[in-house]
Amino acid sequence: MVPHRARRLLNPMAVGPLAQQLGSLTVFTRDDFEEEWHLVASGGFSKVFQARHKRWRTQYAIKCSPCLQKETTSSEVTCLFEEAVKMEKIKFQHIVSIYGVCKQPLGIVMEFMASGSLEKTLPTHSLCWPLKLRIIHETSLAMNFLHSIKPPLLHLDLKPGNILLDNNMHVKISDFGLSKWMEQSTQKQYIERSALRGTLSYIPPEMFLENNKAPGPEYDVYSFAIVIWEILTQKKPYAGLNMMTIIIRVAAGMRPSLQDVSDEWPEEVHQMVNLMKRCWDQDPKKRPCFLNVAVETDMLLSLFQSPMTDPGCEALTQKVSCKPSLSQPHKVSKEVNQEIADSVSSDSLKWILQLSDSKSLVASDVYENRVTPLHFLVAGGSLEQVRLLLSHDVDVDCQTASGYTPLLIATQDQQPDLCALLLAHGADTNLADEDGWAPLHFAAQNGDDHTARLLLDHGALVNAREHEGWTPLHLAAQNNFENVARLLVSRQADLSPHEAEGKTPLHVAAYFGHIGLVKLLSGQGAELDAQQRNLRTPLHLAVERGKVRAIQHLLKCGALPDALDHSGYSPLHIAAARGKDLIFKMLLRYGASLELRTQQGWTPLHLATYKGHLEIIHQLAKSHVDLDALGSMQWTPLHLAAFQGEEGVMLALLQCGANPNAAEQSGWTPLHLAVHKGTFLGITHLLEYGADIHACNKVGWTPAHLAALKGNTAILKVLVKAAAQVDVKGGVSCTPLQLAIHSPK
C-alpha cells in the first residue's frame, strides 16, 4: 500500500456524502502525476492509463470513465466510488490492489500490472501448458476468495480483459463494478450494455431465459468456463457472430467449439476441459462451486508440473575460422595499372598480373574489399612472385576488409616458406583479423607446429586471445594437436586460461575425450578442478560426454569427484541421469558421495529413477542409500517413478524397500500419482506392497477420487476390490461416486 497522504475533499456537488465514505482511500488529482499518461487499455465504458506519481516515483494504473469527466451528481459517479471502496477492502494476492480515487480526471487509482491483461496476451503470445494451467488456477483462487467473503462478492464481469498479469505472469483480477450496475439496469439494458462491453459471451443462459433471474455464484462459474476455453484455445468465443445469434445459441445449450481440443493435448489439459464443461452446464445447479473448482485446478496444476529438471546438456561447438574468398580478378583499371607500374618494372608487372586464367585484376575488388596484389600473390602461393613484390615499397601488413593480412593467409594455407619471407620483411605476428584471430591461432588450428614455432620465434604472443577468449592452446586442445600443445607449453603458455564461457584448455580436451591432451595438460600442472561459468569442471564434461579414459585419468590425478555445478549437480548426478553405469561405478570407487543433493534436493537415486536406469538403481540400493530421500516438493524416488508411469522402476524400488505410503508436501502418495497416470501394473505393485487405499491428500482427495475424475473404470474397480470407499466424501464436498457420475468418460 502506498503511503497515506492528506485527502482533498471532492466537490460536494459531485459526490455528496460519498466523500465521507472513502475510508482510507487517497484522493488524487492529475497534478499528483507526471504529465505523460499512456493509454494501456480501452473499453466501451472506461479507459485505463499508466501514469507515474511525482513524489513516490511509482507507476500506477488509473481507470477513467470518458463519460464522467464533468462534475456531475449522476448515479454512475456514485457507482464508480462505491466500486473503489469495495475493491479497497479486498486484500488478496490474486486481486488487484486499489490505492485511491482520482478527482480530476474522475477515476480509480490501482496498482500497475506490467504485463497488461490476459485479453491482450492471448492473441500475441503462444502460452505453454504449465502457464495456461497456472493462470486458470490463480483465477479460480481469486474467484474462490471473492465468493468466500460474507456475504459473497460476485464479480459478474469475469473475462480476460479483467484478468491482469504482473511481470512474472501471475494473475490479479480487477473490476467489480458490474454488480451495482446490474441492480440499476433492466434485463434488456444489461444485455445491451454487455454487448457494448464485449461481455455478452460470458453471460450464462439463465440470464437470457429467466426475466427475473437474479445472478448468483453460478454466473461467475459459467464466465470462468468461457475464460478456460479462451486460455486453452487462445481464440475468441463466438468470433464473427452477432448479438442475437450468440444469445440464441447459448440459450439453446450450445457452447464454443471444441474442434481445437486435440488428442495430443496432455491428460491434465483434457481433465481441465472436463472441468470447463461442468462449469458451463446449462443447469446452474450442476455447476461446481469455486471451492471445488480451486481444489481441482490445484490438483491438475500440481500433477502437470513435474518437479524434476534435467541437468543441462553441455554443448561445445567446434571452433573454426575459415580464410576469406579472394575472388580472382578479371581486369585492372588504368589507374591501378599505373599505380602498380610506378613501383614495379614492366616485366614484373606482367608477372604479377598473371595470377589466374584471366591474367588480370579487378579494380573494384582491390579498393572495395581492400584486397591488394600482395594478398592475391600470397593466396596463390608463389614464393618468387611475393619476393619480387616485397622488393618494392608495399605494405607487408596490409589488411582486407575482414582484417586478413598476407601473413594470416600464408599461415592458414600452411605455407611456412611464405610465412618466413613475410616475417623477414617485418610482418606483424600479432596483427589479428576482425574476429581476433592472430596467425598463431591459425597455426594451432591446423596443427602446424613448424609455422607456430616460426611465429613464436618472431614475437607472437603465446596467450593471444580471439574475441571469445580462445587462446592457441584452446584450439590445439580442441583439435587434438599434441605437437602444437607441447610447443605452446614449452613457451610458457598459460595452462588454465578461461575463454568467455569459462572453459580452460583442459575443459576442451576433456569434452572431446582427447586423452593425450588431458594427460599433457594435467601433467604440466593445469588446474584439474577449474570451473567454467556454470561451475562445471573438466570432470563434469568428461562424464557427460562418456569419455571413460579422460575420466579415469582426471580421477587418478586427483580431480574432485564431488565438485558441484551451478545447479548443484556432481559428476555422479550426471552419470546417474545419463545412465552411464561404468562411469557411475568408477566415480564410486574414487569416493563420490551417494547422498549429495542438487539445488532442487535430488539425489543420484532420484535422477536414476526419473530416467529409468535400473542398473544404477540396483547399484545404489546395494550401497544402502536412503530409498525414501525427499527431493523437491518432498518427492521420493517412488513418487517420481509413479509420476513417470515407470512400472518396472516402481517394482524395483518397492522390492528394494521403498515406502509406498510416503506423502509429498501436498499429501500425494505414489498411489495417487500412479492412478493419475493410469499405470495399471504400477497400481497393482503398490497395492501388493501395502499402499494405503484410503490415503488423502491435503484437500481430501483419495486415489479413488482421481480414478473417478478420470473416468477410469478398470482402475476404479481395482481400487474398490482393494476396499476403496466410493461413497465417502472424506475431506472434500463430493464422493468418488459423484465425480464418476459427472465424468463424461
From Swiss-Prot:
The active site is at 157 (proton acceptor). GO terms for cellular component: cell projection; cytoplasm; nucleus. SUPFAM superfamilies: Ankyrin repeat (SSF48403), Protein kinase-like (PK-like) (SSF56112). One of its GO terms (molecular function) is protein serine/threonine kinase activity. Its EC number is 2.7.11.1. It comes from the Eukaryota. The keyword Repeat applies. Residues 34-301 form the Protein kinase domain. One of its GO terms (biological process) is cellular response to retinoic acid. ANK repeats lie at residues 369-398, 402-431, 435-464, 468-497, 501-530, 534-563, 567-596, 600-629, 633-662, 666-695, 699-728. InterPro entries: Ankyrin_rpt, Ankyrin_rpt-contain_sf, Kinase-like_dom_sf, Prot_kinase_dom, Ser-Thr/Tyr_kinase_cat_dom, Ser/Thr_kinase_AS. PANTHER family: ANKYRIN REPEAT AND PROTEIN KINASE DOMAIN-CONTAINING PROTEIN, ANKYRIN REPEAT-CONTAINING PROTEIN-RELATED. This is Ankyrin repeat and protein kinase domain-containing protein 1. It comes from Mus musculus (Mouse).
